[in-house]
C-alpha cells in the first residue's frame, strides 16, 4: 500500500485505472467526506460549541432528536444539494425525500444517510458516526419520487460510514473491497490507512444488548446461551460480549478484528420486523461487511436481497464474521 494517499487521490486512481467510479460518483463521495469533516468538528467541540443535549423535537420515528442530529443532517444536505451530482436525498431524520432545488443542477444519484448514528452516546463522549448509501436514480421518467429509492441493497453503487472517535475514520466501498481512511487534521484530508479489509470468518466476540434477552426469539436466545456456556458448552470456546449502543462503533470493531453484531426482532414491538432502518443503516453496513468477507442477514434472508417497500422500513440485523452469522441463520431455519 502506498503511503500518504489522500482520499481524493485514491478515488481518482479508482476512476482512472480501474474504471470503478464514474466521475460524478467520485465527486459525490468527496463532498460526503467533506461534510463528515465538518460534522467531526462539531462533535469535537462538544459543550464548547453548545451542541450537546436535546433539540426539543422528535424525528419521524418519534425519537427525541439531539442538537447534533439536526446539525449533522443540515450539514449533509447543504454540502450535497448544490454540486450537481444528486437528484435527491433521504435521511433517517426526515419524513420524506429531499429533492435537489431547481436552482441547482441535478445529477443521477440518490443519497441516503443516517446523519448521526448512536446519538444517545453524544453527551457521554462515546464514539458515534455517519452512515451513508448511494443509489442510481432509475431511468425512464423525469423527476424523482419516493419509489425511486425502493431498491434492494444489491443496487448500491457506494456505501460507507465515518466514525467520530479517538480518530475520525472513513470506511468506504464502491463494490471492490473495503478501504479505510483516517482524517489527518494537520493535512486537512482523509488519508488511506488500510485497503482490502477482511473480517475473520470465525470469532469469539458477540455484540448484543443483553438486557433485552427476555424479549428475543428462540433462535437468538439459543445462540447467545451457547456463547455464554463457554468452553464447556456446545461451541467449545469462551466468548466475550461487547455492546456500545452505537452501530457504527460496534461494526467498526468487527471490521477491525472480527465479531458478530445482532439487533434482533423482539416481542415488545411484535409488528415491527426490527429496530434498525433498512435503507440508512442495514443496507450500507451489510454491503460493507460482505465486501470485507463477512455476512449480513435478518436471521432468515440476506439483507441486501430485501426489497424495501417504504422509506423508513425497519429490519432485524445479524452481521459480521461469516461462520457465526451462518450459525444464527441456521438456528432460525431450524426453529
UniProtKB/Swiss-Prot annotation:
One example of a Gene Ontology biological process annotation: fructose 6-phosphate metabolic process
EC number of this enzyme: 3.1.3.11
Cofactor: Mg(2+)
Pathway(s) this gene product operates in, as recorded in its UniProt entry: Carbohydrate biosynthesis; gluconeogenesis
Single GO cellular component term: cytosol
SUPFAM superfamilies on file: Carbohydrate phosphatase
Cofactor note: Binds 2 magnesium ions per subunit.
Residues binding Mg(2+) 1, per UniProt: 92, 114, 116
GO molecular function: fructose 1,6-bisphosphate 1-phosphatase activity; magnesium ion binding
Family in the record: Belongs to the FBPase class 1 family.
Protein name, UniProt field: Fructose-1,6-bisphosphatase class 1
Origin species: Delftia acidovorans (strain DSM 14801 / SPH-1)
